[in-house]
Amino acid sequence: MIRKRIASGTMMLCAAMMLVACSNQTESQNVSWKIDSNLQHIVNEPEILTSSNPGDYIAANTEAYAQILDTGEEGLNFLIQQLDSSSNDGLKEWLMAQASTELLGERNLVEHWQSGKDWLRQYKMKVE
C-alpha cells in the first residue's frame, strides 16, 4: 500500500515537472515568435521602405514596436542573443539594439552607437 502511494506520488511529481518544463518552453517560443514577427512587420513596412532613418520605421509601426517591448526581460535576452548571432548589421539589427536599450532602461551603459553591432560590442565591453 505504501509502495503504491510512493509510486503514485512520484508519477504525479514527474508529470507536474514535465508540464512546467513544457509551459516554460512554450512561453520562450511565444516571445521569440512575437519579436520575430513584429520585427519583420516593421522592416517590411511598404510606406517607408525608402527611408534611411531607422526611427521612421519605429514611428510608422508603434504598435508592433510596443509589442516587442512588452516581452520584457525574456525579450531582452532573446534580442541580445539574436543580435549576437546575426551576420548582418542592417535595419533589423539596429531595431533590435534600440529595443534592447529601451528594455534595459537605466541599466543601458552605452550612450552613443551607430549600428546594432556597434551597440552590442560596446554593451558587451561594459558589462563584462
Annotate each language-model stretch with its function.
Residues 25-128:
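Extended repeat-based scaffolds of very large eukaryotic assembly and lipid-transport proteins
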Residues 18-21:
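C-terminal motif of bacterial Sec signal peptides marking the signal peptidase cleavage site
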Residues 1-10:
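Bacterial N-terminal signal peptides that target proteins for export
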